Design a protein with these regions (language model features):
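N-terminal glycine-/serine-/threonine-rich beta1-alpha1-beta2 phosphate-ribose binding loop
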Residues: 6-45
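Single conserved hydrophobic/aromatic residue that forms the stacking wall/gate
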Residues: 1-8, 12, 214-220
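Short glycine-rich anion-binding loops that position phosphate/pyrophosphate groups of nucleotides
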Residues: 30-32, 55, 80, 108, ...
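Substrate-binding/catalytic subdomain of NAD(P)-dependent oxidoreductase enzymes
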Residues: 128-213, 217
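Conserved anion/nucleotide-ligand pocket segment
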Residues: 93-147, 151-153
Length: 221
C-alpha cells in the first residue's frame, strides 16, 4: 500500500531509516512520490536501495544515482526495464566495453498484447483492452501503458545507461496506441506488415540524433 500520510512517513523513518539492522531497502510503492523521497532518505542513511519503479527512476535518474554515489551505497533497478530480461545488467556489465549506437525495441508488454490480438483475431482496440483488463494484463486505468508513458520511462532509463545521456520521459516524442483502429491494422496487413509500438534512440557522432516512441509497420514473418 502506498505510504502517503505524514504518520506513515514517520513510521518509515523510525522503523526503517533509523534501524541499524536494516542494510537494504526495497522500494515497492510505485509512482514518483513519495517513493523518490523515501529512496533518497534511505541512501542518505547508508542503506542500499533496490527498486523496479520505472516512473520514479526515469523522472529522477540523476538525483537517485548521484545520491547513491555520494553516500557510498548501491542503487539497483534491473527490474525497472524488461522484467526478467537482464538488459540493464548486460549494458553495465558484460557489454560495458561496447559503444552503443542505437536502442530499438518493444518496451511495453500490454500494448504489444493488444496490437497482436487486434492483428491476429481482427478485434477492435476496445475489445482487446477489456480482455486484457479482465485477464490482469492491463490496469483498470491503462493510460500509462496505452499512451506510451510506461515505454517512455523505460526508454529514458535505457538511454541513460547505454548512451550516458539523460532525457526526461516527457521530452521523448511519444504516441500511444489508443487511436489505432481495425482499419489501420487491415491497411498494414495489405502491405504484409504489422503495427508495433517501438521505442528507439540513436547516437551519431556523440550526439543524440533521434529518439521517439512511435508506430512502425514491421514486415511480417
Amino acid at each position: 500500500t502506498p505510504i502517503k500520510s505524514s504518520a506513515a512517513s514517520d513510521v518509515y523513518k523510525r522503523q526503517i531509516i533509523k534501524n541499524p539492522e536494516i542494510d537494504i531497502v526495497v522500494e515497492m510503492l510505485g509512482g514518483i512520490e513519495p517513493a523518490t523521497s523515501f529512496m533518497v532518505q534511505a541512501m542518505k542513511a547508508g542503506k542500499h536501495v533496490v527498486s523496479a519503479n520505472k516512473a520514479a527512476i526515469a523522472a529522477n535518474y540523476g538525483l537517485l544515482t548521484e545520491t547513491a554515489r555520494e553516500n557510498g551505497v548501491r542503487f539497483l533497478f534491473e527490474a525497472s526495464v524488461a522484467g526478467g530480461i537482464p538488459v540493464l545488467t548486460s549494458i553495465t556489465g558484460a557489454l560495458q566495453s561496447n559503444n552503443f549506437i542505437e536502442i530499438m525495441g518493444i518496451l511495453n508488454g500490454t500494448t504489444n498484447y493488444i496490437l497482436t490480438k487486434m492483428t491476429e483475431e481482427s478485434l477492435s482496440y476496445e475489445e482487446v483492452l477489456k480482455d486484457a483488463q479482465d485477464k490482469g494484463f492491463a490496469e483498470a486505468d491503462p493510460t500509462a501503458d496505452v499512451e506510451g508513458i510506461d515505454a517512455a520511462n523505460k526508454l529514458s532509463i535505457l538511454m541513460a545507461l547505454a548512451f550516458d545521456k539523460y532525457v526526461a520521459p516527457e521530452d521523448i516524442p511519444t504516441k500511444g496506441i489508443s487511436k489505432i483502429t481495425d482499419r489501420d491494422i487491415s491497411s498494414a496487413a495489405l502491405q504484409n506488415k504489422v503495427i508495433k509500438l517501438i521505442g528507439t534512440a540513436r547516437m551519431e557522432d556523440g550526439k543524440l540524433q533521434y529518439l521517439s516512441l512511435i508506430h512502425i509497420s514491421e514486415p511480417t514473418r
